[in-house]
């Protein structure tokens, strides 16, 4: 879903610059005891700013028409879009303009296509492997749950993956 007019193109190019500089496109594997397969792959886009510039994140939310903005306790604010359709639409708009985080965006878009079918053990495993690839491209925290943890759990549950 490409922006069609020049004004929209400028807005999304500006926003992509923000994401490249002060944002994070991420996929993480989350333990979920209430899930049949015990794991979920969660995808998100987050942009951080000092709370003194909180208004910029509100502008981003308005431009995209989705996401949440919150003030943290450490003097920072964050804008976040989590999961599915909203994130897919957002990444598709930003993809032509992303530079540093283009590879992460492409991988997360692949994961999003798999999300509706992750109750299938093999699809969950594919999504987890893609999440590991996203993790290799990010500068964030060390991951505690990897695709190998998902594979081991699925085997214990009697699934061949």
UniProtKB/Swiss-Prot annotation:
Native species: Chlorella vulgaris
Described purpose of this protein according to its UniProt entry: Probable endonuclease involved in intron homing.
GO BP: intron homing
Entry-linked InterPro entries: Homing_endonucl, LAGLIDADG_dom
Any one GO molecular function term: endonuclease activity
Keyword Plastid appears in the UniProt entry: yes
Name this polypeptide is given: DNA endonuclease I-CvuI
Transmembrane feature ranges: none
Keyword Chloroplast: yes
